């Protein structure tokens, strides 16, 4: 039976970076520069405005919100209504910074485009960046093809990142010092389909069975994938799916950020405001974190 999607917020420019934290749903709206919280009835609050475009979100152990500032390639904190620079990522990021996952110790892993998508530059690899609390940023992994959505397993031992332009999910062991090792392919999405309609990973989230829900804008769907690449389920959307997160009281509500926009045309996204937050109920709960 097809699952039924419901729109709980529309009129957005480009929703991204969805997170479920302390029984609330949060996300960034790129081109309005706003970070929102939102409930299941569509009631929302603007948490903060980020002048250089917010993207990935996370929280420190003390509850301080972390926000990736895209265009100036910085990591910011937001606490007591004060937006503060934590780290300058510009030396390690090839172009705009994007998604982020933060572990229970406050270590932040941050992706970036690697090349200027707006100018049509040639695709090239880049770094996945690590920012430890109170330390300078460093390279967690190099030669990553557009590191995007990222999750950490419930035991805190494995990080999995979506490489958008390689159409794969790549896993690493997380060492005691938060560095990464033992790189391997977790799922090759190009090998997961036989019709040539290859999903590409954008935002994603982990469920309690260890499968990952992956938003794929290229195929207008979110897919549930297990290690090895088997696609367990697909939920189609009318436009493009850019990110997803499990939340709700039982952690079985899948929040999906959708938009007609391509992600490389800010003017169109601002003009059309086709972005939505859609929800759908699924069978397996999340784990309360990406």
Kindly give the residue locations of the regions a language model identified.
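A short loop-to-beta-strand structural motif that recurs across blades of beta-propeller domains
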Residues: 34-36, 74-76, 126-129, 168-170, ...
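Beta-rich, blade/repeat-based domains predominating
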Residues: 9-23, 50-69, 91-108, 114-115, ...
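Blade-level signature of beta-propeller repeat domains, shared across WD40, Kelch, NHL, RCC1
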Residues: 246-290
């Amino acid at each position: 039976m097809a699952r039924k999607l419901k729109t709980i917020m529309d009129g957005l420019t480009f929703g991204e970076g969805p997170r479920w934290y302390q029984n609330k749903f949060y996300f960034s709206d790129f081109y309005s520069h706003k970070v929102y919280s939102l409930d299941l009835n569509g009631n929302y609050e603007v948490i903060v405005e980020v002048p250089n475009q917010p993207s990935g979100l996370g929280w420190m152990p003390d509850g301080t919100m972390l926000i990736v500032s895209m265009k100036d390639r910085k990591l910011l904190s937001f606490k007591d209504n004060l937006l503060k620079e934590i780290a300058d990522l510009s030396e390690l990021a090839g172009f705009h910074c994007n998604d982020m996952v933060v572990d229970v110790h406050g270590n932040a892993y941050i992706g970036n485009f690697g090349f200027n998508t707006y100018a049509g530059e040639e695709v090239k690899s880049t770094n996945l960046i690590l920012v430890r609390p109170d330390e300078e940023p460093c390279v967690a992994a190099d030669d990553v093809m557009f590191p995007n959505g990222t999750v950490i397993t419930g035991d805190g031992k494995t990080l999995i990142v979506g490489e958008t332009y390689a159409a794969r999910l790549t896993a690493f062991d997380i060492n005691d010092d938060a560095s990464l090792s033992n790189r391997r392919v977790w799922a090759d999405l190009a090998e997961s389909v036989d019709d040539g309609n290859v999903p590409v990973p954008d935002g994603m989230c982990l469920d309690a069975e260890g499968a990952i829900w992956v938003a794929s804008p290229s195929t207008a769907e979110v897919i549930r994938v297990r290690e090895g690449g088997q696609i367990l389920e697909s939920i189609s959307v009318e436009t493009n799916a850019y990110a997803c997160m499990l939340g709700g009281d039982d952690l079985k509500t899948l929040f999906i950020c959708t938009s007609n926009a391509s992600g490389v045309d800010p003017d169109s996204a601002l003009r059309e405001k086709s972005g939505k937050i859609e929800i759908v109920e699924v069978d397996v709960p999340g784990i309360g974190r990406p």
